[in-house]
Amino acid sequence: MIRLLTFLYLIFINTVMGEEILFEDFINKPEKKWEFITDQVMGGISDGKVEFLSEDNKNFARMSGSVRLENNGGFIQIRKKLDFRINKNSKAIKIDVRGNNQEYYIHIRTSGTILPWQYYQASFIVSSEWETIDLNFANFKRSGVMLSKNINPKNIKSIAIVAYGREHKSFIDIEKIIIY
């Protein structure tokens, strides 16, 4: 019953108020909500792991590993499916992150991304210090011409943090993800 009331409350706040929605804070059993995926699903040899940690009163996910390009590979990611609907007027995603001074991506899948290789992506660079990065939905690029040019926030199905596209060591901590 509490779960249902929480769900209804989130929908109400998101739909009526149009305020910030906490997508993830890595406090309440994140290991049950996040999936670690590598290019091994398609024959690649990238490897890594996700850990859920706590340090200095911060709970966060740490994704680490090696991105390799052999066998048409080139990614590792953590992904979470949405269990609520985002307000169509939401404009951006905000993440609190730190890492190894490398470029990473957010991949968004919507009800229109039918094939496994379809997504919308935006890049960001992390530093070794915690920082907040804002990514406007209008700046996400579609992975192919078969997709609509723009993301309709109410159709978002999942959000992923991705190390992608070049050989490198991945090391990124994600403390919070907010949609607003």
Task: Identify the meaning behind each predicted range.
Residues 1-9:
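Sec-dependent signal peptide recognition
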Residues 9-17:
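Hydrophobic h-region of N-terminal signal peptides that target proteins for export
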Residues 2, 16-180:
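Beta-rich carbohydrate-recognition modules and glycan-binding surfaces
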